[in-house]
Amino acid sequence: MLIKALNEYYDILARNDKVCKDGFSKQNITHMIMLRKDGTVSDIINVEQESEPDSKGKTKLQPISVVLPERTQKPGIDGNIVEHRPLYIFGLNYDNKSGTYSTEDSTDKAKKSHKAFVDKNLEFTEGMTSDIVTAYRNFLQKWNPQDETEDELLVNLGKAYSTANFIFGLDGHPEIKLHDTDGEIAQKIAELKKSVGPVQGNDICAVTGEKGEISVTHDKIKGVRNANATGAL
């Protein structure tokens, strides 16, 4: 009874945008990539916010929490729709000692990650026409990591690059972001979630008591004591 009540309460919160809806999750973000409509990068803006003063009166910059399409839980190389990870987006490794960027690594991870990002997002955004998605698609098709190892904006990021998490905005209109809940990408994800059919047939859910599709797997559960930091299965 308690679990069912909690499940119903979560549904109420989701309807009122108090928690993430199905198909979306929260991600800490440090920077916003500003894209011109032709796909070139006009700026990379730090969007971190100053924390409340601690007991000594000191403050620090903290990432903002943003709702993005659900992040992948698959091991190995797998891109996200609206990617936030620098290696996937830019296809570059940063060397802290030399302060330089390179596409090279022993397993070609940078190249493989960037390709996975580009292929997945071009396929998903096919046919979309909004200015921000057009800019994003142009970026996907134009950005060549090998030609961008000395990009001024990335050079200025320096060591922050490796731990940064990104979102995308439209140059001249920072209020328009790729992940906006009323944007084409978010709407497509919501529609896909509604249209997904049964995976392994229907049965009675042990939590809700309602009849529905049976999931083959579930996402990793984070915060479980003594479990892997990336989440428990």
Residue map of PLM features:
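Conserved phosphate-interacting/catalytic interface
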Residues: 1-199, 203
